[in-house]
Amino acid sequence: MKVLLIGSGGREHALAWKLAASPLLEKLYCALGNPGIAAVAELADIGVDDHAALIAFAKEKHIDLVVVGPEAPLVAGLADEMRAEGIRVFGPSRAAAQLEGSKGFTKDLCARFNIPTGAYGRFNNAPKAKAYIRQQGAPIVVKADGLAAGKGVVVAMTLQEALDAVDSCFEGAFGAAGAEVVVEEFLDGEEASFFCICDGKTALPLGSAQDHKRVGDGDTGPNTGGMGAYAPAPVMTPEMVARTMRELIEPTMRGMAEIGAPFSGILFAGLMITSDGPKLIEYNTRFGDPECQVLMMRLNSDLLALVNAAVDGRLDEVSLEWKDEPALTVVMAAEGYPANVKKGSVIRDLEKLESIDGVKLFHAGTALKDGAIVASGGRVLNITATAATVAQAQARAYEALKLIDWPEGFYRSDIGWRAVEREKANR
């Protein structure tokens, strides 16, 4: 099969690496890609927002399957446009991608189909949002309705923080994404990311992960797209997975079909595991980044065969095989992230990681300049490891990371701390 992968981050490098291992693959292309992806795929210089060029490329190369990595082209309707041209594509329609594209849409769906989530209000002006916040009190959560690259959420511990967050949304901090605001109940518990692959009818669990949103050690500083992750999430016991499928995922699949937008693609539930069980924080309609990297490290099954089954509506015939070992990934980011990122610094000695057992390096915001790898984005490298325990995977990843010569890079030194503490307690 000839496959076109769309995207250029660490998530897409992990997908490319896994797709490239499939015996079904004849040729892999990636638009835009990065220097890490270039090792397993032929890169095409087409941006993810240039739908016409992507469609033309898919036709010219006789692509059998398109796999869309990031959320923005899905919310913008790329999958619909490709399907209309007779191209097989893995990813939800524009209507189904509203689960990620509009927080308000998802909250209304939860209300209609009795899916457990925090109480909420939707507002298109600041005075009404502020009145609701004053009525509810803090802590409370303020979210921009639309896509804001994972940065449109403020968990306000004080009333003033919440009111300021409303102002920044309506003053245009998130552009069109902040034209509507969702204010919701603060949920207490432990967060987990839970993934399913879906074909419109069937949802098949792809496992859980826990990511680390804040930029600094000890979960301090501003939110980011994610500074590291590990899988599986210990809080997602078999019983909790069964409850999540029964109480959240299956009603969502039924609800989306009922409103005429059946969901196919990756459904990523951001969960809060509370004393009452799992509650939905938000849905995303693609793999998480960096959660995808740890899921791919643990997946033994053929990813291309799996995606094919999803596109053809055959997931009810599929069973998956996983490594028993946990996986952990640490993000190396460029100085200044998540604010003003310094780009262009040279990264050396990446080849030293190739010989380390159980370690895989995924490229994210990297580029090739004059024969050298340079930082071209905020999150730049993902050092990923598997081992018998999370503590061992953590040690392995950090040991590998220290071989990289990149003074302008930084990372959190405590990725996986919750799971490591749990392992110590359970010894």
UniProtKB/Swiss-Prot annotation:
It holds the Pfam family GARS_C. Keywords: ATP-binding, Ligase, Magnesium, Manganese, Metal-binding, Nucleotide-binding, Purine biosynthesis. ATP binds at residues 133-193. Pathway: Purine metabolism; IMP biosynthesis via de novo pathway; N(1)-(5-phospho-D-ribosyl)glycinamide from 5-phospho-alpha-D-ribose 1-diphosphate: step 2/2. One of its GO terms (biological process) is 'de novo' IMP biosynthetic process. It comes from the Bacteria. Mg(2+) binds at residues 282, 284. Belongs to the GARS family. This is Phosphoribosylamine--glycine ligase.
